[in-house]
Amino acid sequence: RDHGKKGIWKVTGNDVEVIPIDVAFPVLHGKFGEDGTIQGLFELAGIPYVGCDVLASAASMDKISTKIFADRIGVRQAAYVADTARDLSEKEETIAKVEEKLGYPVFVKPSNAGSSQGVSKAHNREELEKALALAKKHDHRVLIEETIIGREVECAVLGGQNPKASPVGEILAAAEFYDFDAKYNNAESKTVIDPDL
């Protein structure tokens, strides 16, 4: 490949056309869009893009990695247990750790999934077993976190050298927690911009 030609290479039979791209805006959501995959493709093709680089995207999309990084720099966060077994073979060991370290209720999340897909709230052992099975359908790495009672707020940070925070939004879920349905299918869920905190 000629590294001097940047862009998307369209190959049709023996014909090759390079389609130049000035800059890409990766507006993909979730897996392959926010996990470093598309960013890596842009870098391989020599296409400039906006947003986080490959490492930042991959590390921040993976909830367990994010917890480890946050812990290393002293960010306070919910206590957690990580289950990284490829299947449910270590389920009993995970449940024992959860019951010893966290208690109930807990949130169970696939480590690499977005939009709260595969996320459950477990109030007891039976619900935890079901939640682990559901989360493992989305990713073999599963994060189990203690429940923290409080108001849920969100804030985006934009920019690299001179980052700026967006206004804070408070999430008012129309369900017990802000799951996939509450986010995308329930019109009763709301986000209040600049709430009274």
Question: What does each model-found stretch correspond to?
Answer:
Residues 48-52, 77, 165:
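Short hydrophobic/aromatic-enriched beta-strand-loop microsegments
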Residues 47, 113, 183-185:
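Short connector loops/turns at beta-strand edges and beta->alpha or beta->beta junctions
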Residues 1-55, 59-65, 72, 83-96:
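ATP-binding N-terminal substructure of ATP-dependent carboxylate-amine bond-forming enzymes
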Residues 120-197:
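Phosphate-binding site of ATP-dependent enzymes
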Residues 14-18, 57-151:
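Active-site nucleotide/adenylate-binding loops and adjacent lid/helix of ATP-dependent enzymes
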Residues 35-37, 117-118, 154:
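Short glycine-/acidic-enriched loop or helix-start segments at secondary-structure transitions
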